[in-house]
From Swiss-Prot:
The chain crosses the membrane at residues 451-471, 487-507, 523-543, 558-578, 695-714, 723-743. This is Chitin synthase 1. Belongs to the chitin synthase family. Keywords: Cell membrane, Cell wall biogenesis/degradation, Glycosyltransferase, Membrane, Transferase, Transmembrane, Transmembrane helix. The lineage of its organism: Eukaryota, Fungi, Dikarya, Ascomycota, Saccharomycotina. The keyword Ion transport does not apply. Requires proteolytic activation. It comes from Candida albicans (Yeast). It comes from the Eukaryota. It catalyses: [(1->4)-N-acetyl-beta-D-glucosaminyl](n) + UDP-N-acetyl-alpha-D-glucosamine = [(1->4)-N-acetyl-beta-D-glucosaminyl](n+1) + UDP + H(+). GO terms for molecular function: chitin synthase activity.
Length: 776
């Protein structure tokens, strides 16, 4: 990157100017300005020639329309005015993440676009294919986005702060649109990168929403305002903080290009491990890394084989735009998707509406799950969803208990109620145009596999306690511990487990995670101790049973069940990880994960169900942003009949130099930034809390009755005759085997396609050998 002025010292007194500008687009009353970029930025640009002036001018639009009426009210976008065909739209949504998280994502996107431009043999991509890609950044609230992020956007030419005004002719501005084709990138170390790093120009649309209206509203701007204007083929969704691999976006796009019936594709999300994998020293991060790996090796491949992935991760996923479009009658995937925004926005405004839609509001906490189901079950179509393992992206995972609980509360509640929704509406599959074979397998996945998984999830608390109770109860019959030694040890840990679970209910109902993080941490540690104790007792039981084998013992059946269960978990996990050439998490994270299983099973489940009244995304809506009616644009007709506006602003060159100074200051004093923000849940009304109580009571009593029934039927020391324990162990084995078979099927399918495509290329290129692994 060419050296940008380093000798600048900021001046406290800024130059204020007033000027009249002629509006360049839109209809009467729409403010669209062409503003020159700062002089210092123009000096370092390698490309300045363009018939549209896209490298030397930034377009600002004060959008007074709602997203659904964007085009109808005369608003448009640069790419449409230039007559360009858009193949991919890349949308980055953000709230108040820091500049390091934003730079990490944006620089990764620019490297992906550079890769598209480097594919000279492609029929679609090539040298100038950056013109086919539009990057859209949507910031959720002008008073919420961090100033440091705006400084990075200013440095790349994509933002000029002095242009944003809350009103135009007394009409409220709902979104500020800044459009610029940038040639500058800033990496996560806050260092400038340019064309000497083989980066290509990138068309950027920065949409700065005036009010904070949640992420789903940001997607409304994307899908209902911008996409109808751009009409892209594929839409890629990214969260700020996610670092896509250099080929991730191409690999996602290729899934759509290869199969015309693919409506959505999920990339592989990896936990950010840090330099030298330092983050794995945190057990919480290590357990999440293992969980993500299991999902990417076992769950996602199985679902992809069926054609229906229950959730496409918002951090890295893609959709075919034509598949998202509604039917002519207004029903369809997007209509169902945005119903969640209407429900949640009305939650605090209309109590009666809240009563009618409480369960739907919880369901739409996982609105992306609803979108996935609506795509696969879209009437008269045969869309499928695919997992693209070669499209990878790193994301920062919660590193504290409070952040972890807040994130998983929404995931668990949304997933549970969304699963009920898809099970209830599974008959919609018969209105699709899928083949009979596909419909059959979708029923197997959705109605059988998902139903069994849902039942196990619902009774996971009781299954955990009963497994702990019967496994540790085997000590009661051990004579080596004395006449009553085994009984008292069992009783002590049994009461400890009951006390911890009871405490979790109390603290989850009455406390926020950020206010009670030490209590939650203590309870998680105690649960881990219980799990460690149960693990030790299990091994003792296995060793003792083997030692007494053939002497008339009655524990052989349960012994076989335990061994099979262990092989189905540790064994199959290890085997599939090796087959996928990705075994390192088994060595670095498996111990942390298995010790954290009780916390995943109990702590997260209890906290989520005890907070079903909270139907927020974890951020408070900014319904009353700071407004100044005097700070607005006034549009008038001049003597020539043209529309013009008076602008009072500061010197953009001075502003730009000050921005560069601030970025360098942050770079020299750079601290490790996480990109997280504390999120305060909305207060629920009395009705929502009443329903929460009923849900928790029903769930708790159902699990309690099941526990009491099993405890009455089987004695703790009679492990050898315990059919329930054997059933649970075999059920775990069977479910793990099903996942492994599906994962293996996906692997075979992937390699088969790779070799078929390679053979076709060999025939065309003179038998050139394949140069890469299909999974990478």
């Amino acid at each position: 990157m060419h050296n940008i002025n380093n000798g600048y010292v900021p001046n406290r007194e800024k130059t204020i100017t007033k000027r009249k500008v002629r509006l360049v687009g839109g209809k009467a009353g729409n403010l669209v300005l062409e503003n020159p970029v700062p002089t210092e930025l123009r000096k370092v640009l390698t490309r300045t020639e363009s018939p549209f002036g896209e490298f030397t001018n930034m377009t600002y639009t004060a959008c007074t329309s709602q997203p659904d009426t964007f085009s109808a009210e005369g608003f448009t976008l640069r790419a449409a005015k230039y007559g360009r065909e858009t193949e991919i739209v890349i949308c980055i949504t953000m709230y108040n993440e820091d500049e390091v998280a934003f730079a990490r994502t944006m620089h990764g996107v620019m490297k992906n676009i550079a890769h598209l431009c480097s594919r000279h043999k492609s029929k679609i991509w090539g040298k100038d294919s950056w013109k086919k890609v539009q990057v859209i950044i949507v910031a959720d609230g002008r008073n919420k986005v961090q100033q440091s992020v705006l400084e990075l956007l200013t440095a790349t030419g994509c933002y000029q702060e002095n242009l944003a005004r809350p009103y135009v002719n007394n009409s409220k501005v709902n979104a500020h649109l800044f459009e610029y084709t940038t040639q500058i990138s800033i990496d996560e170390n806050l260092k400038f990168k340019g064309d000497e790093k083989n980066l290509a120009p990138v068309q950027v649309l920065f949409c700065l929403k005036e009010s904070n209206q949640k992420k789903i509203n940001s997607h409304r701007w994307l899908f209902n305002a911008f996409c109808p204007v751009l009409d892209p083929n594929v839409i890629v969704l990214l969260d700020v903080g996610t670092k896509p691999d250099n080929h991730a976006i191409y690999n996602l796009w290729k899934a759509f290009d290869r199969d015309s019936n693919v409506a959505g594709a999920a990339g592989e999300i990896k936990a950010m491990k840090g330099k030298g994998w330092i983050n794995l020293t945190n057990p919480l991060v290590a357990s999440q890394n293992f969980e993500y790996k299991l999902s990417n090796i076992l769950d996602k491949p199985l679902e992809s084989l069926f054609g229906y992935i229950s959730v496409l991760p918002g951090a890295l996923s893609a959709y075919r735009y034509i598949a998202l479009k509604n039917h002519d009658d207004g029903t369809g995937p997007l209509a169902s998707y945005f119903k969640g925004e209407d429900l949640l926005c009305s939650h605090d405004k209309d109590k009666e509406n809240t009563k009618a839609n409480f369960f739907e509001a919880n369901m739409y906490l996982a609105e992306d799950r609803i979108l996935c189901w609506e795509l696969v079950s879209k009437r008269n179509d045969n869309w499928v969803l695919k997992f693209v393992k070669s499209a990878t992206g790193e994301t920062d995972v919660p590193e504290t208990i409070a952040e972890f609980l807040s994130q998983r509360r929404r995931w668990i509640n949304g997933a549970f109620f969304a699963a009920l929704y898809s099970l209830y509406h599974f008959r919609k599959i018969w209105t699709t145009d899928h083949s009979y074979a596909r419909k059959f397998w979708l029923h197997v996945e959705e109605f059988i596999y998902q139903l069994v998984s849902l039942l196990f999830s619902f009774f996971s608390l009781s299954n955990f306690y009963l497994t702990f109770y019967f496994l540790t109860g085997s000590l009661v019959s051990y004579k080596s511990l004395g006449k009553k030694g085994g009984f008292w040890i069992f009783t002590l840990f049994n009461y400890l487990c009951i006390g911890v679970l009871t405490s979790l209910f109390i603290v989850s109902i009455g406390n926020r995670p950020h206010a009670s993080k030490n209590i939650f941490k203590t309870l998680i540690i105690l649960l881990t101790i219980c799990a460690l104790y149960a693990l030790v007792v299990g091994f003792v039981f296995v060793i003792n049973t083997i030692a007494t084998f053939g002497t008339g013992g009655t524990s052989t059946y349960v012994l076989v069940s335990i061994v099979v269960s262990l092989l189905s978990t540790y064994g199959l996990y290890t085997l599939m990880s090796i087959l996928y050439l990705d075994p390192w998490h088994m060595l670095t994270c498996s111990v942390q994960y298995f010790l954290m299983i009780p916390s995943y099973t109990c702590t997260l489940q209890i906290f989520a169900f005890c907070n079903t009244h909270d139907v927020s995304w974890g951020t408070k809506g900014d319904n009353n942003p700071k407004e100044d009616l005097s700070n607005q644009y006034i549009i008038e007709k001049n003597a020539s009949g043209e529309f013009e506006a008076v602008i009072v602003d500061t010197n953009i060159d001075e502003d730009y130099l000050e921005t560069l100074y601030n970025i360098r200051s942050k770079r020299s004093n750079k601290k490790v930034a996480l990109g997280h923000s504390e999120k305060t849940p909305l207060d629920g009304d009395d009705y929502a809390k009443d329903v929460r109580t009923r849900v928790v009571l029903f769930w708790m009593i159902a699990n309690l009755v099941f526990i009491m029934t099993m405890v009455q039927v089987y004695e703790p020391g009679d492990t050898g005759r315990n059919i329930y324990l054997a059933f649970i162990l075999w059920a775990v084995a069977v479910l793990a085997l099903v996942r492994a078979i599906g994962s293996l099927g996906y692997l075979i399918q992937t390699y088969a396609r790779f070799f078929v495509e390679s053979k076709s290329k060999w025939m065309k290129r003179g038998y050139t050998a394949p140069s890469h692994n299909p999974l990478n």
